[in-house]
Structures are given as structure tokens and as C-alpha cells.
Curated annotation (Swiss-Prot):
Catalysed transformations (reactions): 3-methyl-2-oxobutanoate + (6R)-5,10-methylene-5,6,7,8-tetrahydrofolate + H2O = 2-dehydropantoate + (6S)-5,6,7,8-tetrahydrofolate
UniProt protein name: 3-methyl-2-oxobutanoate hydroxymethyltransferase
InterPro entries: Pantoate_hydroxy_MeTrfase, Pyrv/PenolPyrv_kinase-like_dom, Pyrv_kinase-like_dom_sf
Note on how the cofactor is bound: Binds 1 Mg(2+) ion per subunit.
Amino acid sequence: MTQLSAAQKPSDSSKALYGGKGTRRITIRDITTAKERGEKWPMLTAYDAMTASVFDEAGIPVMLVGDSAGNCHLGYETTVPVTLDEMTMLSAAVVRGTSRALIVGDLPFGSYQEGPVQALRSATRLVKEAGVGAVKLEGGERSHRQIELLVESGIPVMAHIGLTPQSVNAMGYRVQGRGEEAAQQLLRDAKAVQDAGAFAVVLELVPAELAAEVTRVLHIPTVGIGAGPETDAQVLVWTDMLGLTGGKVPKFVKKYADLREVMGNAAKAFAEDVVGGTFPLEEHSVH
């Protein structure tokens, strides 16, 4: 009889992160055991209660309140200007809009770079004031001490290596880990965050072959975005995934809808009804 690999074995439907029967909050233990079962899982960004509630009802097990909100919702050109106050407000809204998903709050630029103590203060705000179940921060070896202190203090950490958008002024937007030296550094970063206690690590804009190697080497889950199909999980920015983002989107994005067109057409139809005197009608009026 042919033996199925761990990745091919069907997950216990009652324990599956996506499509599972449970109604309680997803925990860090659920995430780590999913890798042990060879179960892949999806993650989406969310920045408000209403959107988060839709994704929660759809069964998305993990949501990231990313500082990508700076680009997607707050009108900034990069993620760099996003503040901890803004991330706390957005994270709290997403927590309120969900009942099952694990909510991960991003630590924005300037909220942890000074060192472990600053990182702990910032992460504590997201946990206490917003109610997130974990925090995310960028950096591999350079963030080792911050991750270590947060984990020692009882705050779960999702790390983020490869392309780190908060470092755009230094790194630019380009693929990370190409070439032997860069690949070895990314592997060192991945092992460093695992050793520091991170429960998962995001790999952004990394060659697929390198991301696959990192996934094999680590015992914690890898979350890919532009990192090929072999990572343990995949994440997309929801406005990209649903076609709300205007202009060109990254190559790694798959659009599952075209909300920008749907919303634009609906707004035009409303405007034309108002101008033409066909809204509101009697059925929309009160007496």
C-alpha cells in the first residue's frame, strides 16, 4: 500500500484550521500542530471589524492587522508613518469583529527598534488594549533579543523576514535571498527567530526554492507572500486579493474578485438614481 506523506494526509476535520468544526479562538498550539499534521492554512490581512467579520465567517483562521493598513486604508505611501496608536485602534476593531480567528497585530516602525524593553511596552499595548493573540515584527538576527523578551513575557511572536516593508528606505522593494550569501543570511535569520521563540515566520518576496528550504529546515510554520507554494501557509493583503487596490499589484497576487469595479459601478448607479430622481422612491420613504 502506498504511504501518504504528512503533507498528503487529510487533516482531522475537527482540528483543521480552515474548515474545522471548532468555534473557539484559534491558539498558537493550533498553529504549531498544523505543521506537525502537514496542514496548510490561509491568512489574510484585516483592518476593520466589518471586513474581519466576513473573513471570520468564511473560516479564515488567522488574520494579520498589518501595518500595510498605511498603504491600503490610511493613505500613506509606505508603512513607515504608521503609528502604534493607529495599530492599536485597528487591531481592537478586528478583534471585536471576530470570534474564532487568531488575530496578529503588527508592531509598526519605530515601536521596537530601540530594543527589547521598547518592544515589550509596544507589544503589551496591543495585547492589553486591542486584545490581539500575538504580535508580528520585522527582522531576523537583528530582532532576536526583542523576540526573546516578548516570548519570555508571555507574548507570542510571528517574525517577518525577507522583504521587510518597514526597511524600504534601505532595502527597496526587491526580491530577497538571491545569491549564495543572501540566501545564507536569510537562513540564519530564519533560524535566529525560531531560536528566539517565534511561533511562525513570514517569508516575503523570497525565491520559491529558498522558501522551500527554509520550510524544511524550521520546525515552526512558514507563511509565504511571494515565496512560492511550499511554505506552510499563505498570506495576502485583502485589498489586493479582492481587487480593491488600484493600479499595478505585485506578481504574486491572485485576484479573486474585482471589488474596485463593483464598488465603482454601485456608486455611479446610486449617483445616477439621485440625479435622475429615481431614488428614493415611495418604498424607501417613511410617513
